Structures are given as C-alpha cells and as structure tokens.
Amino acid sequence: MNFTLLVVVLLTAIAFVGVVIALSNAISPRSYNAQKFEAYECGIPTRGKSWMQFRVGYYLFAILFLMFDVETVFLFPWAVIARDLGPQGLISILFFLVVLVLGLAYAWKKGALEWK
C-alpha cells in the first residue's frame, strides 16, 4: 500500500500545529510582575506554605466501589447467558464471587469500611 498521502497529511498537520504555537508565542503580550507568580486560592492570600500534604480518607471507599462496580459489569452478561454456560460457567462465576466476598471480608477486617 502507498502511504505517501497519509505521511504528507500527517506532516502538514504537525507543521500547522507548530506554526500556530510559534505564532501564538511570538505575538502574545507579556507582562511579568510579582502578582503573576503568587498562588491564588479563592481570593484569600495564603499564609505559610501554599502547598501541604494531607491524607484523603475516602479513596478506599472509591476503590472498593470500583471493585464491586466492575463485579456487576461481569455479573450482568453472565446472568443473561447462565443457562448456556452449564456447570462450568456456574463454577467459574462462583469462584469469582468467592474471591470478591473474601476481598470484602478482608477490607472489612482491616477497617477500610470505617470512616476515621
């Protein structure tokens, strides 16, 4: 196959983007002052360090939600064709559910479901 036209179009697109970015940098106004380099937080001047690390406690809930949400994505198609799969399909989905229940029990035991 001849990809010459595709290469020409791709190079033209890359060149066009490069020209637009260079032109934007060349003609954009620049005014450097002290206020431009300050952190802006809701209009309130910051005191101390503007960035500080803090713990987020809800990420475990989000991960557990995603885990069980993905479970439903696998369960719905299985429920539609459950009769066609036979005993092998039943055993595989039961294994899948047992692993998920064990994961939930582990998370519960470790206190991941408690808001601290």
Curated annotation (Swiss-Prot):
Alphabetical keyword list: Cell inner membrane, Cell membrane, Membrane, NAD, Quinone, Translocase, Transmembrane, Transmembrane helix, Transport
EC number from the UniProt entry: 7.1.1.-
Compartment(s): Cell inner membrane
Keyword Cytoplasm annotated: no
Ranges annotated as spanning the membrane: 3-23, 61-81, 88-108
Cellular component terms per the entry's GO annotation: NADH dehydrogenase complex; plasma membrane
Membrane topology type: Multi-pass membrane protein
EC primary class: translocase
Tree of life domain: Bacteria
InterPro entries found in the cross-reference section: NAD(P)H_OxRDtase_bac/plastid, NADH_UbQ/plastoQ_OxRdtase_su3, NDAH_ubi_oxred_su3_sf
Known catalytic reactions: a quinone + NADH + 5 H(+)(in) = a quinol + NAD(+) + 4 H(+)(out)
Covalent S-S links between cysteines: none
Gene Ontology MF, one: quinone binding
PANTHER family associated with the record: NADH-QUINONE OXIDOREDUCTASE SUBUNIT A, NADH-UBIQUINONE OXIDOREDUCTASE CHAIN 3
Subunit: NDH-1 is composed of 14 different subunits. Subunits NuoA, H, J, K, L, M, N constitute the membrane sector of the complex.
HAMAP family, alphabetized: NDH1_NuoA
Role, per record: NDH-1 shuttles electrons from NADH, via FMN and iron-sulfur (Fe-S) centers, to quinones in the respiratory chain. The immediate electron acceptor for the enzyme in this species is believed to be a menaquinone. Couples the redox reaction to proton translocation (for every two electrons transferred, four hydrogen ions are translocated across the cytoplasmic membrane), and thus conserves the redox energy in a proton gradient.
Family of the protein in this entry: Belongs to the complex I subunit 3 family.
The protein, known as: NADH-quinone oxidoreductase subunit A
Record gene name: nuoA
